[in-house]
Curated annotation (Swiss-Prot):
DNA-binding positions: 58-162
Ranges for region Winged helix-turn-helix (wHTH) 1: 201-295
Lineage: Eukaryota, Metazoa, Chordata, Craniata, Vertebrata
Span list, region Winged helix-turn-helix (wHTH) 2: 296-368
GO molecular function annotation: single-stranded telomeric DNA binding; telomeric DNA binding
Protein name, entry field: CST complex subunit STN1
Gene assigned in the entry: stn1
Length: 368
C-alpha cells in the first residue's frame, strides 16, 4: 500500500519509518537543481525530501566552474547543466605538506632504467593529481547534503577527477538519470501494510504511527515557538487531538483505557524518544521535570564554543581540532553532567549549520 499521512504531511514520512525506504541509505543520483530545491525535514535537521523520499547523501557528476582553495579543503562549484552547487572537498593529509610535483627521469629528460622508487613516486603523483582539479575538469562527488548560511552544499566523503575525453561517462549518466527518476525517485514510497498495522481498521491508531505523529507534532511546536525549556504539562495539550482520534477509531472494538492515561503514556514515550535523539535533555535530575531544547539552549552553545576556542589554542588540538568525546567531557564539567553524546551531536550540527563552528573530520571540530 502507498503510505498516506494526510494533506499536511503527504510529502514527509514520520522519521521512524525512513529506514524502510531503500533510497534513504543510498547515494542518490539527483539533478543538482533538485538538490537545491529539496525541502529540509521538519523532524530532523540535515535530512531532505525529494517528493516522499528522505535523502541526506547524494552522488553528482559535473564540470568544475569555480574553485576556491583553503588550507584544509577545496571548494569546487560543480555544474551538471541543471544547476551549480558548492562541493566542500577535504584535502588528504598526506598531500597537504607536499610542495611541488614529483618528477621521474634524469636531468637530461631521458627516462632511466626501471627504478622502483621512481615508479612509486610516479604513482603517488598520479594519485595526487586526481584530487586536485582545475576549472573545466569533470568531477564526481559523493557526500552529504548540508545547508550553510542558507546555501545548499555537498560535504564530500569521496571525490575524484573523471578522465572522459570521449564523453562516454557523461552520456551514460544522461541516459541513466531519467530512468532512475521514472522508476524510483518519482515513485511514491510503498511498504507492506503489516508495517503500519491494519490498513483500514485503525492504521492511524497503531502505536508506532501514533508515536511518530506525536514526535513530529512536538518538534514542530518547539521549533515554531522557539521554546528554550518546558515541563511535560506545558505541552500535554498538543497530544489531545491524536488521542481523541485514536480513541474514536478503537471505541467500537474495545473499551480501552482512560483518556488521561493514554495521554500520559504517549507523552512519556514521546519525551523519551526525543531524549534518545538528543533533541531535548534534562540539565539537572530533580523532582521538577524540566526539559531543555538542545537547539535553543544558548548557554550550551556558548559552553561548546568556549571549549573549542580555548582548547584549539593548545598544540595537541591546533591542527585537527577537538574530538567529540573531548568536547563532551569538557562541556559536562562546565555545563551539565547529564549531557549525552546525542545531545552534543545535535548541538554541534546546529552550530555548524549556522557557521559558528566547522568540522575538520567526521568527529573533530574547530571554532570559527
Amino acid at each position: 500500500m502507498a503510505v498516506s499521512l494526510g494533506d499536511d504531511d503527504a510529502d514527509e514520512l514520520p522519521s521512524m519509518l525512513w529506514g524502510l525506504d531503500p533510497v534513504f541509505s543510498s547515494y542518490c543520483r539527483l539533478y543538482i537543481t533538485d538538490i537545491l530545491l529539496m525541502k529540509e525535514s521538519r523532524q530532523v535537521p540535515g535530512i531532505y525530501f525529494y517528493k516522499t523520499h528522505p535523502i541526506f547523501q547524494v552522488d553528482v557528476l559535473g564540470i568544475v566552474v569555480y574553485k576556491r582553495e583553503r588550507e584544509d579543503f577545496y571548494c569546487y562549484g560543480v555544474d551538471d547543466s541543471t544547476g551549480v552547487i558548492n562541493c566542500l572537498c577535504w584535502k588528504d593529509e598526506k598531500w597537504r605538506d607536499q610542495g611541488g610535483s614529483t618528477t621521474c627521469g634524469d636531468a637530461s629528460g631521458f627516462p632511466r632504467s626501471f627504478n622502483i622508487e621512481d615508479e612509486l613516486k610516479g604513482l603517488k603523483e598520479a594519485e595526487r593529481k586526481s584530487t586536485v582539479l582545475e576549472i573545466g575538469d569533470l568531477l564526481r562527488v559523493r557526500g552529504t547534503v548540508k545547508t550553510s548560511r542558507d546555501n545548499r552544499e555537498i560535504k564530500a566523503t569521496s571525490f575524484y577527477k573523471v578522465h572522459d575525453p570521449a564523453m562516454a561517462v557523461q552520456i551514460s549518466r544522461m541516459l541513466e538519470l531519467p530512468q532512475l527518476y521514472r522508476k524510483c525517485y518519482d515513485q511514491p514510497f510503498k511498504m507492506p501494510s503489516d508495517d503500519l498495522g491494519s490498513t483500514e481498521a485503525g492504521g492511524s491508531s497503531h502505536p508506532q504511527y501514533l508515536l511518530s505523529r506525536a514526535v513530529l507534532t512536538l518538534k514542530e511546536f518547539l521549533l515554531e515557538k522557539e521554546v528554550t525549556r518546558f515541563r511535560p504539562y506545558d505541552v500535554e495539550f498538543l497530544l489531545h487531538p491524536l488521542i481523541q482520534r485514536s480513541s474514536a477509531e478503537q471505541e467500537a472494538d474495545q473499551p480501552g483505557t482512560s483518556f488521561a492515561t493514554q495521554v500520559g503514556k504517549l507523552l512519556k514515550e514521546t519525551l523519551s524518544f526525543l531524549q534518545d535523539e538528543g533533541q531535548i535533555f534534562r540539565k539537572k535530575r530533580t523532582q521538577d521535570e524540566v526539559y531543555n531544547v538542545t537547539e535553543q539552549d544558548k548557554d550550551l552553545h556558548i559552553a561548546i564554543k568556549d571549549v573549542l576556542r580555548e582548547d584549539t589554542k593548545r598544540e595537541k588540538y591546533a591542527e585537527k581540532g577537538c574530538h567529540v568525546l573531548h568536547i563532551l567531557s569538557s562541556v559536562r564539567q562546565r555545563y551539565s553532567q547529564n549531557l549525552s553524546r546525542e545531545v552534543l551531536e545535535v548541538a554541534l550540527t546546529f552550530l555548524e549549520s549556522n557557521s559558528d563552528i566547522i568540522s575538520t573530520t567526521e568527529a573533530h571540530y574547530i571554532v570559527l
